[in-house]
Amino acid sequence: MSAFSVIVLILIGLAAGTLGGLVGVGGGIIMVPAMVYFLNSSQLQAQGTSLVVMMMPVGALGVYNYYTKGNLGNTDFKNAFIIALGFVFGSLIGSKLANSTLPILVIKKSFAVLMILVAIKMLFGK
């Protein structure tokens, strides 16, 4: 791996981690397009890499910082648990679809449309 690739990967991680900790966005919104665009990763490779990256650091360090600052009381643990249950099964279903039945172009375009819809909602929503 080239030094340039290592630097780009570190910058992608810094951007995704900073935004994840700052505003709670999923790191995949940053990491996936950055890996595809800057490192010529395939869509599936970028998605898989993003999932591995987010397994521990995002949750553990984010919760730790909220806890140490006394803001964990703002967390709705019941909702978090219910979402986590759906997330586990959704992740399993999504990864199976991505790795078996859906054409890569459909996945790539769907991801782009999702990002556009999220951006529009954030720009013009309440």
Predicted segments with their positions:
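Juxtamembrane transmembrane-helix boundary motif
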Residues: 1-16, 37-38, 43-45, 67-126
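Transmembrane helix boundary and interhelical junction motifs in multipass membrane proteins
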Residues: 22-34
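Small-residue hotspots at the loop-to-helix junctions and early N-terminal turns
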Residues: 47-51
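Membrane-embedded alpha-helical segments of transport systems
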Residues: 52-60, 89
